Amino acid sequence: AIAAVTTFLILFTVFGNALVILAVLTSRSLRAPQNLFLVSLAAADILVATLIXPFSLANELLGYWYFWHTWCEVYLALXVLXCTSSIVHLCAISLDRYWAVSRALEYNSKRTPRRIXGIILTVWLIAAAISLPPLIYKGDQGPQPHGRPQCRLNQEAWYILSSSIGSFFAPCLIMILVYLRIYLIAKRRNRRGPRAQGASKGGASKQPHPLAGGASTKPPTLTSSLAVAGEVNGHSKPTGQEGKTPEDLGVVTLPPNWPALPNSGQGQKEGVCGISPEXAEEEEEGGPEALPASPASXGSPQLQQPQGTRVLVTLRGQVVLSRGLGAASGQWWRRRTQLTREKRFTFVLAVVIGVXVLCWFPFFXSYSLGAICPQHCTVXHGLF
C-alpha cells in the first residue's frame, strides 16, 4: 500500500509540475516575471520526485541501502538541496507578495526578469550551501545494524541544527511574519477604503460641472450637433451627423419630460457627455458623481439631469450614459483589478505555504530533537 501511494504521488508530482512549467512558458498571460518563481519551484519539486523519492521508497521497503555507496552521498546531497530549495522558494515568493502589496508602484517597476532570476539564483545558492557540507565532511554515520549498508544523513549535532534552521525554521518564521504583515496591510486598507471613497465623493460633489455654452474659459457645453434633438422636434437631421453615436456607450431613450434643445449654432468640439476632456479626467478622479442641472445655453430651457449619471443628448433624441470615460477611470479600474488579483493570488499562496509547512514540520521537529536530546527524545522508527 505504501509503495502504491508513493508511486502515485511521484507520478502526480512530476505530471502536475510539468504542466505548471509548460503553462508559464507557453501562455502569454502567464509570462509575468514573478511567475519565474513558480517555474523554478516546479523544477525543484520534479527533482525531488525523480531523483530522491524513488530511492527513498526502495530504502524504506528493503530496510537497507541497496545502491552504491557513492550514490548514497550524492543522493543525500540532492535530497537536502532540493528540499531546501523548495522551502526557500516559498519564502522568496512570500517576500515577493509582501513587496508587491506594501510597495506596489515602486516594486512593480523593479520587478524585472533579471531581478527575479537573481533572487532565484540566490535561493539555489542558499540550498547548495546547506547541502554541500555532508559531501565535504562525512561525520558520524551512526551504527550499521546487522552489517547491512545504511544511507543516513549526517548525525553531527551542529549540522542537524544548522541545516534544520537554514532549511526550514528560518524560512518558516519569515513566511509567518510576512503573511501576518500582509494581513495587517490588507485589513488597514479595507478599513480605510470606505472613508477615503466618501471623502473623495464629498469633495467632488462640491465642484459642479454645469452644462452651459460659452468660450473655452467657461464651463463646458453640449455641442450644437449633439444638442439638436431632431427627431423629437420633427426636424430633419443635418447631413453628415448620422451614425456618430460614441462607441462603447449605453443608450437609453430620452424621457418625455425632457425638453428638446434648440440649435445653438456652435460647432466647437467638446468632450463626450458635453464636458471637456480635462473636466472629465477631474471628475473620474473623484468618482462618478451626479452633475447638477444648469442651463444648456443662453436662452435655452433648463436641462434636468438624473442624479448619478452623465448624459449626452443626441440627434435621435436619446441619452447616452458614459461608462468610465477618461484615462483616469481606466487606470483606476485597472489598478483595482490588479489589486484584486494580487489579493487572490496571495490567499492561494498562503494556503499552499501553510500546507507545505504542516507537511514538513514533523520531519524537521523529530530530526532536530535527535540532536538536542538524542537519548531521551528518540522518535519511533515507525512514525515515518
Curated annotation (Swiss-Prot):
One GO term in the molecular function aspect is:
alpha2-adrenergic receptor activity
Is-annotated flag, keyword Ribonucleoprotein? no
- Region Disordered: which residues? 193-306
| One record GO biological process | regulation of vasoconstriction
* Subcellular location, record wording: Cell membrane
Name under which the protein is recorded: Alpha-2B adrenergic receptor
Q: Which family does it belong to?
A: Belongs to the G-protein coupled receptor 1 family. Adrenergic receptor subfamily. ADRA2B sub-subfamily.
Q: Kindly state one GO CC term assigned in the UniProt record.
A: plasma membrane
Please list the disulfide bridges.
Answer: C72-C151
Q: What is the lineage of its organism?
A: Eukaryota, Metazoa, Chordata, Craniata, Vertebrata
Q: How does it sit in the membrane?
A: Multi-pass membrane protein
Outline which residue ranges sit on the Cytoplasmic face: 26-36, 96-117, 181-348
Residue stretches spanning the membrane: 1-25, 37-62, 73-95, 118-140, 157-180, 349-372, 382-384
SUPFAM superfamilies noted in UniProt: Family A G protein-coupled receptor-like
| Extracellular topological domain | 63-72, 141-156, 373-381
Q: Which organism is it from?
A: Echinops telfairi (Lesser hedgehog tenrec)
Which keywords are on file for this protein?
A: Cell membrane, Disulfide bond, G-protein coupled receptor, Membrane, Receptor, Transducer, Transmembrane, Transmembrane helix
Q: Where is the composition biased (Low complexity)?
A: 288-306
